[in-house]
Amino acid sequence: MPRQHAIEDYRNFGIMAHIDAGKTTTTERILYYTGKSHKIGEVHEGAATMDWMTQEQERGITITSAATTAFWDGKRLNIIDTPGHVDFTIEVERSLRVLDGAVCVLDSNQGVEPQTETVWRQGDKYKVPRIVFCNKMDKTGADFYKCLADIVDRLGARPVALQLPIGSESNFKGMVDLVRMKALVWNNEALGAMYDIVDIPADLADKAKEYREKLVEAAVELDDDAMAAYLDGAEPDEATLKKLIRKAVLTGAFYPVLCGTAFKNKGVQPLLDAVVAYLPSPLDVPAIKGVDDKGNEVVRHADDKEPMSLLAFKIMDDPFVGTITFCRIYSGILQSGTGVVNSTREKKERIGRMLLMHANNREDIKEAYAGDIVALAGLKEARTGDTLCDPAHQVILEKMEFPDPVIEIAIEPKSKADQEKLGIALAKLAAEDPSFRVSTDQESGQTILKGMGELHLDIKVDILKRTYKVDANIGAPQVAFRERVTKRVEHSYTHKKQTGGTGQFAAVTLIVEPSEPGKGYEFESKIVGGAVPKEYIPGVEKGIESVLSSGVVAGFPVVDVKVQLIDGKFHDVDSSALAFEIATRACFREALQKGKSVLLEPIMKVEVVTPEDYTGSVIGDLNSRRGQIQGQDMRGNANVINAMVPLMNMFGYVNNLRSMSQGRATFTMQFDHYAEAPANVSAEVQKKFA
């Protein structure tokens, strides 16, 4: 079956936002107006088409990015729904990898919120072209112009309005379209499906003229001919202006800003028009790079004629189909029944069922093309971030980097049957979400779950109980401490056991020193003249690595350390890789003690938004949690407090804050860095763990 839509007519985009800015509602309306969804699902009632996990429906937050296909104005839209809660930033990063453009949704009442900054920065990191939609214009306190100022102040970006609101709060009727210089006015009867194009209201004429000028001036900067014509008094026509706005979006020169209210069905169609007009097709963004099986860089263009390559970006467990792997096809054509290679894991797979996903129903397809986002059922080996490709033209597309978890809990199944269910469930959850890790505590034998925050783990536990019916006891959350040496030391150690039979002999001298934070572990052999034969060096490395997982302060992983092997001795008969491993292990442990190892604790960046009346209590409380206040700011009529607080002092903070502010204050936190723990904290932790 030939390709039905030319690749330049594809728009692979996501909707990114702060929690509660109305992202899911906006996606819902897009599906409604593109004719895919017959009944509008309201998040308030927990029935949105995109939010299809029970946990999401209850919490009213989007957790898993479901990919959906819809059509508008002859263009094919692949919409990737991204979560907006900070504990799920990994999902946002992952979906930003596979989309070409994004709509950033702001709550017009709140402006730019903490999580907006986070997802915006991730968008910057992956150079995602964006347009901005100021949602909730019907809310009390909605302020479109403050949103524009916020984008400059808080995101450091350049916004250019393409629309101005007509009326505000409950009188919000529509918007002035600055490209066409017309007013779009909605009548409330037709669920937003109908709007009238009329002349700009007289009271907005001056403002419209002022902002139209700003738009045209920003646009003509991108083209010398247009600039010359403009200076001669000729304004660009509509087609030229749109072309220039598109160029601005693709280059990041400025960000077009639109407004509306998705909940009240106003402004969604012009937003769709803007997606089609300004966001990139797969041909407008740089081709993806990867490495071939010889390690050379290769480029894969969005072209059906190129060898097939696709990236798995999301894995889900579906009760009807089994494991579903969401993939973006970067090049070539994929047919069901073909054999592919998972080049990341060097495993072969066969493509079984191929599905095109609508938020919660699916359509079987036989063939998919470059630019498509498809769901593959029944892949055995694929994990998030893996590349699947043509066996004759192997490539590994860019690797995704996943952050280390900062919080952990122990989980104990209540019965033997639960134990079995838990094993299966955890394997699936870990495959679906690389920022969620599972390990076993060597000493206690307990299963440890590790994640990015309390909410992250709460939801995983909830899924275990509901979806997989595992009955288990959950321990209190623990902080993921780390250890590091603070001074450079040189240390020698000799291991010998030479009493009858085969003996063991190895001597090593190590230099152990702290490296820059975030550098991790580095090893270097500086052996000259064969003091330690080459074949024993892996034994030395193994010895070091066995200590790294459990340091000398309280048994936590050792980070940011550089180890050099500078000297050693060996015996022709009694030396072995094992002897060198044992010697190095002892030498490294003693060096860590000599090098004054300290305990590091994760420090979280916390932002609290609170009504003025509670500011004093909030700051006092943060100080009592060893928080360092970084600054305060006003946002609307609320006070914004930024602080750095140790994670170990933030457990249960949500309930505390709620009771302190009568439920009116909110907070977000995310991992920022590791810092040395004070002596009293270190002593307490050592008593508990060492």
Curated annotation (Swiss-Prot):
Q: Which Pfam families match?
A: EFG_C, EFG_III, EFG_IV, GTP_EFTU, GTP_EFTU_D2
GO CC annotation: cytoplasm
A GO molecular function for this record? GTP binding
Kindly state which keywords UniProt assigns to this record, in alphabetical order.
Cytoplasm, Elongation factor, GTP-binding, Nucleotide-binding, Protein biosynthesis
Which subcellular locations apply to this protein?
Cytoplasm
Where does the UniProt annotation place the signal sequence? none
Spell out the PROSITE patterns in the cross-references. Answer: G_TR_1, G_TR_2
Instruction: Write out the transmembrane intervals.
Output: none
Return one Gene Ontology term, BP aspect: ribosome disassembly
- Positions bound to GTP: 17-24, 81-85, 135-138
Q: Which residues form the tr-type G domain?
A: 8-283
Q: Which cysteines are joined by disulfide bonds?
A: none
Coiled coil located at which positions?
none
* Main location group: cytoplasm
Q: Which Gene3D superfamilies match?
A: 3.30.230.10, 3.30.70.240, Elongation Factor G (Translational Gtpase), domain 3, P-loop containing nucleotide triphosphate hydrolases, Translation factors
**InterPro entries associated with the record:** EFG_II (IPR041095), EFG_III (IPR009022), EFG_III/V (IPR035647), EFG_IV (IPR047872), EFG_V (IPR035649), EFG_V-like (IPR000640), EFTu-like_2 (IPR004161), G_TR_CS (IPR031157)
* Described function: Catalyzes the GTP-dependent ribosomal translocation step during translation elongation. During this step, the ribosome changes from the pre-translocational (PRE) to the post-translocational (POST) state as the newly formed A-site-bound peptidyl-tRNA and P-site-bound deacylated tRNA move to the P and E sites, respectively. Catalyzes the coordinated movement of the two tRNA molecules, the mRNA and conformational changes in the ribosome.
Protein family according to the UniProt entry: Belongs to the TRAFAC class translation factor GTPase superfamily. Classic translation factor GTPase family. EF-G/EF-2 subfamily.
Q: What is this protein called?
A: Elongation factor G
Q: Which organism is it from?
A: Nitrobacter winogradskyi (strain ATCC 25391 / DSM 10237 / CIP 104748 / NCIMB 11846 / Nb-255)
**Organism lineage:** Bacteria, Pseudomonadati, Pseudomonadota, Alphaproteobacteria, Hyphomicrobiales
